[in-house]
Swiss-Prot record:
Keywords: Disulfide bond, Ion channel impairing toxin, Knottin, Neurotoxin, Secreted, Toxin, Voltage-gated sodium channel impairing toxin
Subcellular location: Secreted
Highest taxon listed in the record's lineage: Eukaryota
Name recorded for this polypeptide: Mu-theraphotoxin-CCy1b
Function: Voltage-gated sodium channel Nav1.7/SCN9A inhibitor.
Species for this entry: Chromatopelma cyaneopubescens (Greenbottle blue tarantula)
Amino acid sequence: DDCLGFFKSCNPDNDKCCENYKCNRRDKWCKYVL
């Protein structure tokens, strides 16, 4: 499965962002997390 990279739209309830990224609940896109 392809993951979602930086600034890609996402669904916080079904987070498909890449490793080290998290779906931001407010902005609805993948943000980098340390």
